[in-house]
Amino acid sequence: MRVKEQLLTLRAYVPGKNIEEVKREYGLSKIVKLASNENPFGCSARVTEALTSLASQYALYPDGHAFELRTQVAKHLGVKVEQLLFGSGLDEVIQMISRALLHEGTNVVMANPTFSQYHHHAVIEGAEVREVSLKDGIHDLDAMLQQVDDQTKIVWICNPNNPTGTYVEKQKLLSFLEAVPKSALVIMDEAYYEYAGAEDYPQTLPLLEKYENLMVLRTFSKAYGLAAFRIGYAVGNTELIGQLEVARLPFNTSTVAQSVALAALEDQAFLQECVKKNEEGLHQYYAFCKEYNVFYYPSQTNFIFLKLGIPGNEAFERLMKKGYIVRSGAAFGIDDGIRITVGLKEENDEIIELLKELVNEQVQKEETYS
């Protein structure tokens, strides 16, 4: 028995190491996980309240249409309920879109590096993947446009981008949307939207009416702190969303996920407090990078990508032995960098002290051999 040939070329997704795994491996009692861009402040207290009322529903199938959540998300965003497609996290939404649109003979255009699942699902569906290197850490939309042809079904734009935290500014996106063929679906993956505060960061939802080939993805996993519950959604053209519903599994979002997402959505004050604290945390890293002359990408997310002057895998291992889990840039094809999730203030302070040690050791080593 053999699976599709294209599956043999892929590897299963490898998430960052979990806390218990690292404790066992290194004999540590305290672990700080700053690898998966989770919200260090948790989730709204309203989520806990919502969970206590669900016990009587455990034996029942969920609302397959997610009516209440759909209604409130549409109201929050100012869109029609028919424009929303819900999934078990954005991973499933990406899978649904890829399954519905891609096949052998088609192609997708994306940046490199960017979120890995765009590439993964394109390969599974037999589509050609056309990757364009980032320019100064940012999507090179001009170069990406050159890769688009009549067989391009999807153009993926991760904005802000994972793993660099950078963003495509409004005017460049508008120029791209005007130039790209209407036959290509331009998907803006805005998983980190709530953290993006730059003045020229594009607000894409108002653009949906003009550009029918535009789609926006958002999630409750990041700023809302609901990663464990797996719920995200797409916003797009009503006709296309209706067609994509056919590819959605029945009851794909659980009663629990729908309920906690609704509770989290209602507590915008908690969300804004998380965003504020995250911005303060980013500035802790910026101050370190500037003082120690460490390269970094200014971030519009809850993580920062930086280069310490040593291989990312080495930095990853050395930090992990101290009880701090980060993500090596090697996982994204940037061998000399690491990605660090912004944590609590004290967590940021602690890991920054370790980063200083790594930088100082490297400087001393270079001076010895110079």
UniProtKB/Swiss-Prot annotation:
Needed co-factor(s): pyridoxal 5'-phosphate
Record GO biological process: L-histidine biosynthetic process
Q: Which residues carry this modification: N6-(pyridoxal phosphate)lysine?
A: 222
Keyword terms of this UniProt record: Amino-acid biosynthesis, Aminotransferase, Histidine biosynthesis, Pyridoxal phosphate, Transferase
Gene Ontology MF terms: histidinol-phosphate transaminase activity; pyridoxal phosphate binding
Which reaction(s) does its UniProt entry say it catalyses?
L-histidinol phosphate + 2-oxoglutarate = 3-(imidazol-4-yl)-2-oxopropyl phosphate + L-glutamate
According to UniProt, this protein's pathway is: Amino-acid biosynthesis; L-histidine biosynthesis; L-histidine from 5-phospho-alpha-D-ribose 1-diphosphate: step 7/9
Enzyme Commission number(s) of this protein: 2.6.1.9
HAMAP family xrefs: HisC_aminotrans_2
Q: Which family does it belong to?
A: Belongs to the class-II pyridoxal-phosphate-dependent aminotransferase family. Histidinol-phosphate aminotransferase subfamily.
PANTHER family recorded: HISTIDINOL-PHOSPHATE AMINOTRANSFERASE, HISTIDINOL-PHOSPHATE AMINOTRANSFERASE 2
Instruction: Fill in the subunit field for this protein.
Output: Homodimer.
Protein name in UniProt? Histidinol-phosphate aminotransferase 1
The lineage is: Bacteria, Bacillati, Bacillota, Bacilli, Bacillales
